Amino acid sequence: MNITREQLKLYAVTDRSWLGSETLYEQVEKALKGGVTLVQLREKTLDEAAFEKEGQELLELCHHYNVPLIINDNVELAKKIHADGVHIGQSDMEIKNARELLGADKIIGVTAKTIEQAKAAEAAGADYLGSGAVFGTSTKADAKPMELELFQENCESVTIPVVAIGGINADNVLLLKGRKMAGTAVVSGIFACEDIEKGTRELLEKVASII
């Protein structure tokens, strides 16, 4: 396995819409200081050159804190900058093709909403799964909340680790206690905090208490 359950405990997913007066680099560093265990760089608007530059800078930053950086969707960019891996959705590149491009030692995470998708992703070589949206989410308007029983069934249907995704924050994360997850993937629950470092630390304490 290319990633441990411990590295999936509190997984930060970047979102440029929360930047305000800060740079993404500054926000990510605050999250790292607060204790995030994995960072996913997700960009939907940058051109390839800017995305590559940002990826290289964040990779160096994350490695300074001994935290892996993975890239959302863009397998070619992940390979180019030697990122630690990728996260791909059901409509993105096939897992076996991503593995061929990246090599055996890179992290491949996959979104899985159903037991069938979870089992198929594990069989194809995924290292971990992201399942949800457990509480709905502002980052994807069409993401309806998943029944927590179904989320738990997804976790129990595979041997690889599963993280909860979707609308998770310090106010609701304790509702996930006992659901067999490895950790949580969080966007606004980290980056929308007025004090990102403090908010991250408080969220990490809650996540650690339920897994």
Language-model segments: which ranges?
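Flexible, gly/pro- and Lys/Arg-enriched active-site loops
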Residues: 90-96, 134-157
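Active-site phosphate/pyrophosphate-handling residues
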Residues: 76, 149, 185
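Residue-level signal for pocket-adjacent positions within structured domains
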Residues: 14, 138-141, 163, 185-186
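C-terminal binding/interaction regions
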Residues: 179, 183
